[in-house]
Amino acid sequence: MKPRIFIAIQYLEIGGAERSLIGLLNALDYMRCQVDLFVYRHSGEFMSLIPKGVNLLPEVKKYTTLTRPIREIVREGYWDIAAGRIWAHLLNSCYQRRSKRKDSIAIFQYIASCTTPFLPSLEQLGEYDLAISFLIPHNIVRDKVKARQKWAWIHTDYSFIDVNTRVELPVWGAFDRIISISESVSKGFLSKFPSLENKLMLMENILSEQFVREQAEMPFDDTFLRAFEGRKGQTDQPVRLCTIGRFSYSKCY
């Protein structure tokens, strides 16, 4: 019988972690393992890139409320999740005032801690050999999934951001392995959680050459390129560049 692997992520919109997950899924041998992918909300440009060998689990409506507008989920009757998210923002505001740090991602852990208790269990899916929480926060895989081994991924260099270590430590500590994507990420993580060194394991992102070439050859909207037409030789016209990223030190913004 093939080993059963469960992988969880919020959505598959364009992002580094999401692209990394697609690379990992493409690298797995589906003749040797069964992979169930649980995407909380079936949205994002990378949904179409999920390999055919992956079993995409159906959406569970209540899990979609974690990232949708609060006003919208209140209209649908999810008062418990809405209240949890509002309470999480209040807790985070108090934490930021105490720590005097503006670049904090502590809010994500507060939201997870305040909403996960209201989410339905996923144990009806049976016991997995391995459950992977691919993106923070990791409470859902910790609390709602039954597995012999549980691994959590860390994609962010914690030396650039502020987190509430008191709140996060019990979550990270519950996992059998913590997978870091680089040496610098490992170093930053251990600067916050030195007691978890024995659980940390390095596994760099998997991105195949074929995937990069396929993405490079995809058609795109050339509106941006047309904006530069006629600029050759015009030294008085500045070059305009556009970059996209989360407004935080960890993304160099």
Question: Language-model features: where?
Answer:
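Short His-centered aromatic/hydrophobic patch
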Residues: L91-Q96, A112, I132-H138
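Nucleotide-sugar donor phosphate/pyrophosphate-binding loop at the beta->alpha transition
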Residues: Y110-L119, H155-A174
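Active-site proximal beta-strand in glycosyltransferases
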Residues: L130-Y158
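A short, glycine/small-residue-rich beta-strand->loop->alpha-helix junction that serves as a flexible
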Residues: I9-I22, K251
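Short hydrophobic "strand-cap" motifs at the C-terminus of beta-strands
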Residues: A8-I9, I181, M203, L241-G245
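Conserved donor-binding/catalytic core segment of Leloir-type glycosyltransferases
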Residues: F6, T223-K251
